[in-house]
Amino acid sequence: MLLPWATSAPGLAWGPLVLGLFGLLAASQPQAVPPYASENQTCRDQEKEYYEPQHRICCSRCPPGTYVSAKCSRIRDTVCATCAENSYNEHWNYLTICQLCRPCDPVMGLEEIAPCTSKRKTQCRCQPGMFCAAWALECTHCELLSDCPPGTEAELKDEVGKGNNHCVPCKAGHFQNTSSPSARCQPHTRCENQGLVEAAPGTAQSDTTCKNPLEPLPPEMSGTMLMLAVLLPLAFFLLLATVFSCIWKSHPSLCRKLGSLLKRRPQGEGPNPVAGSWEPPKAHPYFPDLVQPLLPISGDVSPVSTGLPAAPVLEAGVPQQQSPLDLTREPQLEPGEQSQVAHGTNGIHVTGGSMTITGNIYIYNGPVLGGPPGPGDLPATPEPPYPIPEEGDPGPPGLSTPHQEDGKAWHLAETEHCGATPSNRGPRNQFITHD
């Protein structure tokens, strides 16, 4: 359809004028700039504006990295200020404070990947080998990944640390022989590439085994050889036990000897005198007198038990010293005829060439007069070669003449006989008395 008027010369002249008029009309209408009134409590830009209910107006929000330092009013918009160091605000906000930056806690398994700024908080993630176990808007706690057993590997994920391992089997021609959360399956070794031959094929848990082409295979042990290797040591042990038991039964003295060795006290350990369990040694069956101790026998009556005073008692029949000839003439007693000392007797008993003394023994250690000096006597003092003067002699030392000391008169005693006169008395006995 053609418009002849619009294409005519007058139409072309009025066109720009009409467009300019419409532009002026559009510019004359007022635009809504915060703060502005809102009748339905909604603002045109919800991300950057907010509704202030006290004044019923829409106000501007503060951009990231700032906070509200002065609230808006009907005549003034919101005033913002930059966050201080170590604080942040990530979004458009109308907060009056900034949030504090927090470090990544290594105790909870976190590590830092980006520092904190005024527009962004600290960026944290789980440490290697761990996954996030607690998530609340962000990860707050990490735990160790589970191990994948041999023959498997952990499935790869787009986001590391978001979940626990999910183990999958190794592909054909690959193996994995450890238990690890991060181990990966490896391809089997190709023996021909190394100039070797395959000895054992690879599996999902082990690699291929290669060998030298000239190396012979080890012989496999048959079932018979394996049975002999088990039964021969067992039969040898049973034979040894049988021989030992036969020797033990045929020689019972071995048991007694072993028991005596076990009961013997170690060297240097003596009997305990306080224990009170000491017993005198028993007499030898063939030589009783040689091992009889010089101790009171339990059957003897002690002076303390009878209440009588103790006194040394020796039997009257103490044998005197005998000559060798007399000893040879004594009859020799047979071992069976030798007897022990009778209980309850004290004294000296000689039996079978031995002497047994029971009772108290008193030894006198005085000098012997008139006999030859003994081996323990002191040597005699030699006689001086010159005379010793008497005590009190005023003269010089030398030879002195003996003389009679003055004393009482001499008296003669007479013996009288019956019928005799003094004239015819018999011989007289002279007694010298010294006054």
Curated annotation (Swiss-Prot):
The record's section on InterPro entries has: TNFR/NGFR_Cys_rich_reg (IPR001368), TNFR_3_LTBR (IPR017349), TNFRSF3_N (IPR033997)
Disulphide-bridged cysteine pairs: C43-C58, C59-C72, C62-C80, C83-C98, C101-C116, C104-C124, C126-C132, C139-C148, C142-C167, C170-C185
Q: Is the Disulfide bond keyword given for this protein?
A: yes
Q: Which residues cross the membrane?
A: 228-248
Q: Where are the TNFR-Cys repeats?
A: 42-81, 82-124, 125-168, 169-211
Where Phosphoserine occurs, the residues are S323
Q: Where is this region: Disordered?
A: 373-435
Q: Where is the composition biased (Basic and acidic residues)?
A: 403-417
Chief site of localization: membrane
Locations of Pro residues compositional bias? 373-399
Describe the protein's quaternary organization and the partners it interacts with. Self-associates; dimerization and trimerization are promoted by lymphotoxin (LTA(1)-LTB(2)). Associates with TRAF3. Associates with TRAF4. Associates with TRAF5. Interacts with Aedes aegypti lymphotoxin beta receptor inhibitor; the interaction reduces dimerization and trimerization of LTBR induced by lymphotoxin (LTA(1)-LTB(2)).
Tell me the function of this protein.
Receptor for the heterotrimeric lymphotoxin containing LTA and LTB, and for TNFS14/LIGHT. Activates NF-kappa-B signaling pathway upon stimulation with lymphotoxin (LTA(1)-LTB(2)). Promotes apoptosis via TRAF3 and TRAF5. May play a role in the development of lymphoid organs.
The protein's name in its UniProt record: Tumor necrosis factor receptor superfamily member 3
Q: Give the originating organism.
A: Homo sapiens
Q: What is the lineage of its organism?
A: Eukaryota, Metazoa, Chordata, Craniata, Vertebrata
The gene is: LTBR
